[in-house]
Amino acid sequence: MARERRDSKAATFFCLAWALCLALPGFPQHVSGREDRVDWTQEKYSHRPTILNATCILQVTSQTNVNRMWQNDLHPILIERYPGSPGSYAVRQHIKHRLQGLQAGWLVEEDTFQSHTPYGYRTFSNIISTLNPLAKRHLVIACHYDSKYFPPQLDGKVFVGATDSAVPCAMMLELARSLDRQLSFLKQSSLPPKADLSLKLIFFDGEEAFVRWSPSDSLYGSRSLAQKMASTPHPPGARNTYQIQGIDLFVLLDLIGARNPVFPVYFLNTARWFGRLEAIEQNLYDLGLLNNYSSERQYFRSNLRRHPVEDDHIPFLRRGVPILHLIPSPFPRVWHTMEDNEENLDKPTIDNLSKILQVFVLEYLNLG
């Protein structure tokens, strides 16, 4: 009971402190004129973030802890976890358990389906975690949790896909944990526009090909879910709008965790959101909040353009969803090798990128 009282007092203090942050200079209120918009599916195109000031950036970044993330979230995921394997089940249970234990009260669902593969029919399970299912619009942060299948090796090694994509999974879980109070505050807000915009985390199964990448042997989870969301009415009872139209922005994380990543712009129609990541990176650097970081090795480079690469965003892109693809170019040197393991991860880089992503999410959700 004493613990519950302390938690209650801490939550009350947090809400007061966060409300004070909202009142400080540098936190513009939500964009005026939204009340005049009739078609909510178009609001994503005029949506503007609320820029966090230095005070709140310091508060937000103090809440995240890369060592705790490493122990509590990354280690349990750094196992062989190809679709249908015991490791896949264990990781799926871990992700659900971590999200279900948070104050914010996420709705955590498994989207299970069967699909034909080069090895016959296999069962796949996506994990969809929604902060507020009643909200019309959702910022989506996504990654895949499966690891690529490799036949048994003579030396007994297994592929654990540290950058591909254990680290993105752990970053998303840490985001949900470290921002738990802000997200609880958002969910409890009953006034527009906050009530109409929320957060969704998606962990895809079956991103990797079993044999060779092809339209039929890859992206099993995202192909299935995009099709399902394109045919599921949203909000419930709607006749002409569907879940996929409720995606404001689809942010996909992949191949993250190696040192000195470079993220280029893949889609010009979301370049303004990429620009926010670049600006947040600079702000955190100016505040001395990035570890082992050199401004000469900037992560996000809006002056660098690359052709899109195939990944879990493709089925959503084809249905008109705005995409922000956070995958480095070039890929990590350990990509699809047994060396994509914990030894070759760079903890300061992961910590820095986690901070940038968390600030970005708060700004997008107008929680600044």
UniProtKB/Swiss-Prot annotation:
Q: Which InterPro entries match?
A: M28_QC, Peptidase_M28, QC/QCL
Q: Which residues are glycosylated?
A: 53, 292, 352
**Enzyme class, spelled out:** transferase
Instruction: Please list the tissues where expression of this protein has been recorded.
Output: Expressed by the venom gland.
Q: Which GO terms describe its cellular component?
A: extracellular region
The signal peptide here is: 1-33
Kindly list the biological process annotations in GO that this record carries.
peptidyl-pyroglutamic acid biosynthetic process, using glutaminyl-peptide cyclotransferase
What is the superkingdom listed in this entry's lineage? Eukaryota
Where mainly located? Answer: secreted
Q: Where is the active site?
A: 207, 254
What family does the entry list?
Answer: Belongs to the glutaminyl-peptide cyclotransferase family.
Q: Tell me, in a sentence or two, what this protein's role is.
A: Responsible for the biosynthesis of pyroglutamyl peptides. Has a bias against acidic and tryptophan residues adjacent to the N-terminal glutaminyl residue and a lack of importance of chain length after the second residue. Also catalyzes N-terminal pyroglutamate formation.
**UniProt-recorded name of the protein:** Glutaminyl-peptide cyclotransferase
Name the source organism. Gloydius blomhoffii (Mamushi)
Traced from the root, the source organism's taxonomic lineage reads: Eukaryota, Metazoa, Chordata, Craniata, Vertebrata
